[in-house]
Structure formats: structure tokens, C-alpha cells
């Protein structure tokens, strides 16, 4: 599996940074920044494929499915990070979006030797998490050939589970084992083979796009405001108050009052204010509107 690494774009030498070891600090940072600029353009070229991923993921989640990120090393950590941000940002159940990293939680903080090379372990993850055709899996691997990820993708498709691949090399093995391919080609890294850099940045941008767009399509956003956030600390309560203020144009004190009356649910508070209803009626309108605030307000204004 590790043969012909030199054929991978991410493993090639970057001609623009061959002298980075003798550059002064400013030139060194400019060289890194010049490479980073290329990342967003590489992701932009893949938007048509990201659209496919967003549409299928949102459809699965609307129908009680789950989203799983599967990766190793940096790619695995990025999946875990993105998944862990969904509950506080969008008020989702931690089971809805899950990140799985080769080697388990221990690998989040330090490398677990050999974990990424175990294809059978990747296969077993599908059964361990009780994945079904209602779910969707996204495999993340810069090289496009990480055995742990490939094993998971193969097993997913074997069980009629939609598999999506995010990689940074053309014609890679993962692209032969997924239903949707997302392949931002970022070119050779600043430091040869250090895919935590441009490849990792590209992966993070793609994950940001997928979960953000999916949550919008699930009614977790009103305008560009996060209105389903979980209020687990003072900072988030303050943010929720500001969100209600902005969405309804009420004063801070009134926003806080309605937030309390809505049992600390910002979207309920917004609908209460916009439709001049009590919390139970706002909840009913939101249920009728499948959780979409704009639709709930229209229903309550009839």
C-alpha cells in the first residue's frame, strides 16, 4: 500500500519552497502564505461535487440517518473536530454527526502506531457503530489510499451505505471505492509530505462547507444566525441574546426575558416575538414548519 508514494502530488517536492530553510522569517511566512492561497481555489473547483455530498447528507439526516467521518492522523482529527462542533453550534444530538479516527480517542492527542494501516479495523467500524443504509459515511485521506479509511469505505458500500471520499490526489484508491468524490488538488506541500498543511486545510474547508450547508438545510439557521445553539455557558447565553436582538430588533432585556420564557431555546424565542405567541404555540409552529423559523413565522402570521 505504501509503494509508489512518490507518484502522489502531496508527496512531491515543492519547487517554490526548496530554499525555505535559509529564508528569513518574513520570507518563510510569505512562502507558506503563498501556498495557502492556492487552497481555496482548489476547493472551489470541487464545489459541484460538494453539492452532491450536501444534498445526500441532508436528505439522510432528515430521515433519521447519521453522518460519520472516518480518517486517520490529521484527517481523522479534522473529522472529530468538525463533528464535535455540531452540538454546541447547532444543538444537535452528539450521535447525529460522529468523527471516527484510526486508533480511537488516544490517537486524537498522539499517533497510534500502525492504526491507519489496518484495513480490517476500518471495515469493523461499520458494524461496531451499527451503520445502515439510512446513514452516510465520509472517508477523509490526503493520500487517498489510507487502508483504515479504504476498508471502511468498502464495507460501507457492501452494506449499501452511501460513501463519500475526500482526498487530495487524483485517481486515488478511495475514488474507486466511494459514490461521491471530492478531490481538491492543492499540489506539493511547503514541507514535502506534510499533509497537515495545505491538504489538511483543504479538508477542513470542505468539512466546514458540508456541515454548515447541511445544518442550514435542516433549519438550524435563520438568515445567517445560528438559532439552535446549545446554551452550555455564559458566553453562549450572551450570544443567544444578541442573536434574538438582531433577529427581532428588540432590546437586550426583552430578548433575555423571551429566551428564559422559551426555556433557553433561541429559535423558539424568535418565533414567540415575531408571531406574538406563547412558547407552546411557537413550538407547535416550529414543529409544523419542520424546524424552519422563516416558515414558522409565516404560519403564525396567517
Curated annotation (Swiss-Prot):
Recorded GO MF terms: carbohydrate derivative binding; carbon-oxygen lyase activity; ether hydrolase activity
Highest taxon of the lineage: Bacteria
UniProt pathway: Amino-sugar metabolism; N-acetylmuramate degradation
Recorded catalytic activity of this chain's protein: N-acetyl-D-muramate 6-phosphate + H2O = N-acetyl-D-glucosamine 6-phosphate + (R)-lactate
This protein's encoding gene: murQ
Record-linked Gene3D superfamilies: 1.10.8.1080, Glucose-6-phosphate isomerase like protein, domain 1
NCBIfam families in the record: N-acetylmuramic acid 6-phosphate etherase (TIGR00274), PRK05441.1 (NF003915), PRK12570.1 (NF009222)
Residue intervals of the SIS domain: 57-220
Protein name: N-acetylmuramic acid 6-phosphate etherase
Misc. comment: A lyase-type mechanism (elimination/hydration) is suggested for the cleavage of the lactyl ether bond of MurNAc 6-phosphate, with the formation of an alpha,beta-unsaturated aldehyde intermediate with (E)-stereochemistry, followed by the syn addition of water to give product.
The enzyme's E.C. designation: 4.2.1.126
